[in-house]
A protein has these predicted regions:
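Short helix-to-loop capping/linker segments positioned immediately adjacent to catalytic or ligand/cofactor-binding
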Residues: 95, 153-161
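A composition/biophysics-driven feature that prefers long, compositionally simple stretches
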Residues: 1-148
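Short catalytic-site patches enriched in acidic/histidine residues
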Residues: 29-39, 124, 161-208
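Active-site pocket-lining segments that scaffold enzyme catalytic pockets across diverse folds
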Residues: 144-153, 163
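Short alpha-helical functional segments enriched in proximate histidine and acidic residues
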Residues: 12, 156, 173-177
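Charged, amphipathic alpha-helical interaction segments
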Residues: 148-151, 158, 175
Length: 208
């Protein structure tokens, strides 16, 4: 599954004239490798190459991935950008994704001034947008579970309940249906809160 996804990204890179790309978005790296970690402020990148010699750049604080790619480890005290710069081809155009922080990109550009950097997020984003059969089945199952949980939540709500009570109930129902987690605390909004598209459930009580 992951190799097929990588192959689609490599094909898109080839259409852009790229032989290498640095993927830094954690969700995109998870999509391509199955390795799930959130790096916060630390460098984290998956280096894709046309020849298949891919590399995963990781801080030693991260768990060891089960991924069949060369792993390049570093610590907070290492010159990790020099390590990265020396591992890539500094003479060929480099694709980068749209979310890579300037604190990483600018030093890399200084290390390899002969390299042209190209915004190449579409190579990964377009692959992620085109769902395969497994993903479509997972989406259908997620939608089914969501329908079940929303029906339970509607039946559960009573006058006097707080937004947070209902939100916590919804989370518990997703867990009961086998979900690992929710992307965020469910949005439960009473009254004027309904005008806030990203409202965080609080202690406001439901009034009839």
């Amino acid at each position: 599954m992951y190799q097929e996804r990588i192959s689609r990204v490599l094909a898109a890179m080839e259409r852009m004239g790229l032989e290498q790309m640095l993927v830094s978005d954690p969700d995109s790296i998870w999509y391509l490798t199955g390795y799930d970690v959130f790096p916060f402020e630390r460098l984290y990148a998956f280096y894709l190459r046309k020849d298949g010699q891919h590399k995963l750049f990781l801080n030693k604080l991260f768990p060891v991935p089960e991924a069949p790619y060369e792993q390049v480890w570093f610590s907070d005290t290492d010159d990790y950008l020099a390590i990265l710069a020396n591992a890539v081809d500094g003479e060929k155009d480099m694709g980068v994704d749209k979310d890579w922080p300037a604190r990483f990109l600018l030093p890399l550009m200084a290390h390899n001034p002969s390299c042209k950097y190209v915004l190449a997020s579409d190579c990964v984003d377009d692959a992620r947008a085109c769902k395969d059969a497994v993903e479509r089945d997972l989406m259908r199952e997620a939608s089914r579970i969501n329908d079940v949980v929303m029906e339970r939540a509607a039946a559960y709500m009573k006058e006097g309940m707080t937004e947070r009570e209902v939100a916590d109930y919804i989370v518990a129902q997703y867990a009961a249906e086998g979900c690992d987690s929710t992307a965020f605390l469910p949005i439960v909004s009473y009254g004027a809160h309904a005008a806030d598209p990203h409202h965080e459930a609080d202690q406001t009580r439901l009034k009839a």
